[in-house]
């Protein structure tokens, strides 16, 4: 594959693009599920909740039942949202808050693809030619920053210190469903273009994702797109219709 033309900005998806889809589905989601009952029992409809933020988020759900029945109903509802991978902003806020506990305890470490780390470091070293990197995920911005702040050090050549890496300094901005909207809607990408001041030259923005519906929504706004082809990703029947990226070595 020949080198890409010079873009003025990169907009990147996370799961299935920057890290394995399995990390989200098999590690992050189960970690949250493990704690759902506890956070509901300790904070929902409690006069003195253990965590005010969680209590505020849980109160947004319209649960008619009272007492223990209400708590059980909310637990069931949250588990259904997770099972269906529902893009619910309140759920995403709760997940990020719970994951923070796992990141801080060392239970959660992010297996970012090595070529992604190489790209971020290489791009940062371009000086005045550095291309801004933005992240767009359904996960909350809080969760995004946690993810980039706890990248597993797996012996990459750029490793300078032991333990997890904080790569947030390589990221120029973050977008989620609260700040931009759903990733399958073109208006969301219009908001992002406006925010990063690229409305007049959308083709100079490259959006990479493993989801064809997201790519199509971005294309409607004139954004250049590429399909992330990572092992374990869901097969895209019309993958041939998109420029395919197996690694970030050409960015």
UniProtKB/Swiss-Prot annotation:
Residues annotated for substrate binding in this entry: 137-138, 183
Q: Which GO terms describe its biological process?
A: L-methionine salvage from methylthioadenosine
Per UniProt, what is one Pfam family of this protein? Answer: Hydrolase
- Pathway involvement? Amino-acid biosynthesis; L-methionine biosynthesis via salvage pathway; L-methionine from S-methyl-5-thio-alpha-D-ribose 1-phosphate: step 3/6; Amino-acid biosynthesis; L-methionine biosynthesis via salvage pathway; L-methionine from S-methyl-5-thio-alpha-D-ribose 1-phosphate: step 4/6
Q: Where is Mg(2+) bound in this sequence?
A: 13, 15, 210
Q: Where in the cell is it found?
A: Cytoplasm; Nucleus
Swiss-Prot/TrEMBL keywords? Amino-acid biosynthesis, Cytoplasm, Hydrolase, Magnesium, Metal-binding, Methionine biosynthesis, Nucleus
Q: Which cofactor does it need?
A: Mg(2+)
- Cofactor remark from the record: Binds 1 Mg(2+) ion per subunit.
Q: Name one GO cellular component term.
A: nucleus
EC number annotated for this UniProt entry = 3.1.3.77
Catalyzed chemical reaction(s): 5-methylsulfanyl-2,3-dioxopentyl phosphate + H2O = 1,2-dihydroxy-5-(methylsulfanyl)pent-1-en-3-one + phosphate
Primary site of residence:
cytoplasm
One example GO MF annotation: magnesium ion binding
**Family per record:** Belongs to the HAD-like hydrolase superfamily. MasA/MtnC family.
Protein task: Bifunctional enzyme that catalyzes the enolization of 2,3-diketo-5-methylthiopentyl-1-phosphate (DK-MTP-1-P) into the intermediate 2-hydroxy-3-keto-5-methylthiopentenyl-1-phosphate (HK-MTPenyl-1-P), which is then dephosphorylated to form the acireductone 1,2-dihydroxy-3-keto-5-methylthiopentene (DHK-MTPene).
Q: Which PANTHER family match?
A: ENOLASE-PHOSPHATASE E1
Q: What is this protein called?
A: Enolase-phosphatase E1
Organism encoding this protein: Candida glabrata (strain ATCC 2001 / BCRC 20586 / JCM 3761 / NBRC 0622 / NRRL Y-65 / CBS 138)
């Amino acid at each position: 594959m020949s080198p890409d033309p010079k873009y003025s900005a990169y907009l990147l998806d996370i799961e299935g693009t920057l890290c394995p889809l399995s990390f989200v589905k098999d590690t992050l989601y189960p970690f949250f599920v493990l704690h759902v009952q506890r956070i509901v029992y300790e904070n929902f409809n409690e006069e003195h909740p253990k965590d005010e933020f969680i209590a505020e988020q849980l109160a947004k759900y319209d649960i008619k039942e009272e007492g223990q029945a209400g708590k059980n109903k909310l637990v069931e509802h949250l588990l259904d949202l997770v099972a269906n991978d529902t893009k619910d902003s309140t759920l995403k806020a709760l997940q990020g808050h719970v994951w923070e506990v796992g990141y801080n305890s060392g239970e959660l470490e992010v297996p970012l693809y090595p070529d992604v780390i190489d790209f971020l470091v290489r791009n940062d070293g371009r000086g005045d030619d550095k291309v801004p990197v933005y992240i767009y995920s359904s996960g909350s911005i809080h969760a995004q920053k946690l993810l980039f702040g706890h990248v597993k050090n797996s012996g990459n050549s750029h490793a300078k210190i032991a333990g997890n890496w904080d790569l947030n300094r390589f990221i120029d901005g973050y977008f989620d469903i609260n700040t931009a909207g759903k990733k399958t809607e073109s208006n969301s990408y219009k908001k992002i273009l406006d925010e990063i001041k690229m409305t007049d030259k959308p083709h100079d923005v490259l959006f990479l994702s493993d989801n064809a519906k997201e790519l199509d929504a971005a294309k409607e706004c004139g954004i250049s797109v590429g399909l992330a082809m990572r092992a374990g990703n869901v097969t895209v029947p019309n993958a041939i219709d998109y420029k395919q990226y197996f690694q970030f070595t050409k960015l």
